[in-house]
Amino acid sequence: KDKEILKVIACADLDSNKSELFSKNYKIDKFSVEEIFVNDDIDLIVNLTPPSSHFEISMKSLEHGKHVFSEKPISLSMEEGKKLYTAMKKNSVYLFAAPDTYLGPAFKKGTELLNSNQIGQIIGGSASFITHGVEGWHPNPEFYYKKGGGPLFDMGPYYLTALVKLLGPVIQVSSYSEKNFNKRLVDNPEVKYKEIEVEVDTHYVSLL
């Protein structure tokens, strides 16, 4: 809860029951979403909202002079990303986004090996993630199949970040995607609903 350079001040959620429970469990204050933005004791906001809300919450945070660490994706479009960048510069704050796995020891070692030419000339890299879906285990799988969800935004950032970190920026993209199923059947007994209307593509093949 409290570290030498970090103190958790409060939590907020549109669902007051969730924020109340979190507040009691971790013994921190519970604020409304709007209170989080204007509280002078808060320097950094961790944005863990659903993907479709990332841009709105991050933008309001930046406009109120707060640093932001956002869950992936940082936004749902390039235009939204540019607006966040502009707001960050204008308000002299920092904007970070998951995943931060590229800061780990494996990537540091990989970068070291590449830069020292110990493994020769690299001509490419590959990454894959294959699974049936999250509806069999996730406590709230519906968001995954709505706007801002799907494997591209949920798992893609891990692999894309790794490739860019090790091999450099992407210049050109060729990609194919499809939905596969229009509906997903939920077989997790803890989830109340049993069927999900799929709104996003769930299968991607890309060449970068």
Describe these PLM feature segments.
Residues 44, 50-51, 55-102, 117:
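Beta-strand-loop-alpha-helix segment that lines the small-molecule cofactor/substrate pocket
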Residues 6-10, 43-45, 149-150:
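Short active-site oxyanion
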Residues 29-33:
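Short acidic-hydrophobic, aromatic-tinged amphipathic segments that line or gate anion-handling sites
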Residues 21, 35, 44, 56, ...:
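Alpha-helical elements of Rossmann-like donor-binding domains used by nucleotide-donor carbohydrate transfer enzymes
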